[in-house]
From Swiss-Prot:
Keywords: Chaperone
Function description: Required for biogenesis/assembly of DMSO reductase, but not for the interaction of the DmsA signal peptide with the Tat system. May be part of a chaperone cascade complex that facilitates a folding-maturation pathway for the substrate protein.
Assembly information from the UniProt record: Monomer in solution.
Pfam families hit by this protein: Nitrate_red_del (PF02613)
InterPro entries in UniProt: DmsD-type, DmsD_chaperone, DMSO/NO3_reduct_chaperone, TorD-like_sf, TorD/DmsD_chaperones
GO molecular function, one term: signal sequence binding
Domain of life: Bacteria
Protein name: Tat proofreading chaperone DmsD
Organism ancestry: Bacteria, Pseudomonadati, Pseudomonadota, Gammaproteobacteria, Enterobacterales
Cited SUPFAM superfamilies: TorD-like
Organism, scientific name: Salmonella typhimurium (strain LT2 / SGSC1412 / ATCC 700720)
Amino acid sequence: MTTFLQRDDFAVTARVLGALFYYSPESHETAPLVQALLNDDWQAQWPLDAEALAPVAAMFKTHSEESLPQAWQRLFIGPYALPSPPWGSVWLDRESVLFGDSTLALRQWMRENGIQFEMQQNEPEDHFGSLLLLAAWLAENDRHHECEQLLAWHLFPWSSRFLDVFIDHAGHPFYQALGQLARLTLAQWQAQLIIPVAVKPLFR
């Protein structure tokens, strides 16, 4: 069994990252996390090298004329085209659509494994943030095999490309730092994964 999935820090970091990508920065789920990242205490608790985290921590605290809620709206809601859409099927489907074949494959996998996960409104299950929250839930419930499959089959095949584009187009230091923190953290997870990551073509 992959030991990193059994550590408490995996579930904690997956839940923190998932919430910050999924919920508004003003929400009750996320507002305390935003404040924590604006201080320096979090670095000692994050399972990455302090030297790698230092520039990320500095960027979190960099001032921007655009407010955090405005940046959230622009990056995740619209009304204009999102610079880096957070749904897997946008990257994995030839037509770059929501609810694409990869979303249906994720739903089938969830049904086969008896996994039910509540989404906000009528939203695809393959949102980057919601997949991280699901990974945290699986780890917390000792379903490490399913957690490995979720990461290797349904998240890692597209997450690196999503994060690269997200960082390049974030346009706000907080979300640029969040993208970098996610990229560093997921790279460490992937390096420790036992089962191979599925190779899937990307269309963005």
